[in-house]
Amino acid sequence: DIISSNIAICQKYGYAITGIKCREAILESEDGFTSTTSIPRDKLIRTQTPQTFRLGNLIAAHEEAKAKGITNSVASCTLMAELGGRQMHVVPGSEKNIKITTIEDLEILKALMKVQPESWLK
């Protein structure tokens, strides 16, 4: 269970990030239209929720970020990476662990709810 694993890892190490290995091909683009660079996926992790932190550590990190002028992090895990020196521990996630933020996410959720595992998939 992802939540229980996050809690256990956070209690042991102070941070827990849910993530899955990247399977997609990743390109880097400066303009969003063209690319001449690919990023090797073997070291990439796609983060998911939940992300679990000890409250004191998280508050201290946000205060440090504010003092350093870091204001554009997209998530707590990226903030920790930008601050540096914080080793985050990854808890295995799932492709079915989707975050609902867009209409497309809702459509994916609806499709997942309709799927019945076939016996050959077990």
Regions inferred by a protein language model and the residue ranges of each:
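Conserved beta-loop-beta/alpha segment of the NTase-like Rossmann-fold superfamily
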Residues: 1-30, 48
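Short secondary-structure boundary/capping segments
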Residues: 7-8, 35-37, 80, 89
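Solvent-exposed alpha-helices and their adjacent loops that cap or buttress functional pockets
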Residues: 9-10, 37-38, 71-72, 92
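Intrinsically disordered, low-complexity segments enriched in polar/charged residues with Gly/Pro
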Residues: 13-14, 38-39, 85-87
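Short, flexible, basic/aromatic active-site loop/helix in glycosyltransferases
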Residues: 27-51
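Conserved alpha/beta core of the MobA/IspD/sugar-nucleotide pyrophosphorylase nucleotidyltransferase superfamily
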Residues: 45-122
